[in-house]
């Protein structure tokens, strides 16, 4: 699953309800309190206590490292955590919340998918995009769907590298969030 889906989850959530979108810049003094407070709000509104994960922008890792000493929260770094069958290494645990650090370029409120016709293609931050500092969601909330499209098979005549066949395929990915699960999503967005 792509972390670019963070923008899709944020956009969907912000269009329907803004109660779990906190506008704050994460610093050493407020990082732990902001994320813990948002998690508590999401847990209360969704009425589910376990199964959450936080995606945190990597540029805020230092704020959590510096704040780890002066808090009553249990913070540990370098854990291996299994989330939906995938094991992630070097995960920070904030109390019982696994926090996966992801590149800032993937944590934007608006993204633009470039077609590749008149530009280089790929995914870039959209116009007026804000940084998402943290995205909290229940592991069962976003439903990722993959579709195999445009299968091409190359025989020995086209494949000059060796005497055999080669297959090329294009995968399409999408993300769905059921309306009844929106209460289990929260975000901290840069002001």
Residue ranges and their predicted role:
Residues 70-191:
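Sequence/fold signature of self-assembling virion shell proteins
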Residues 16-87:
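Extended, solvent-exposed, turn-rich assembly/linker loops in the middle of proteins
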Residues 9, 13, 61, 91, ...:
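Generic secondary-structure boundary/loop-capping signal
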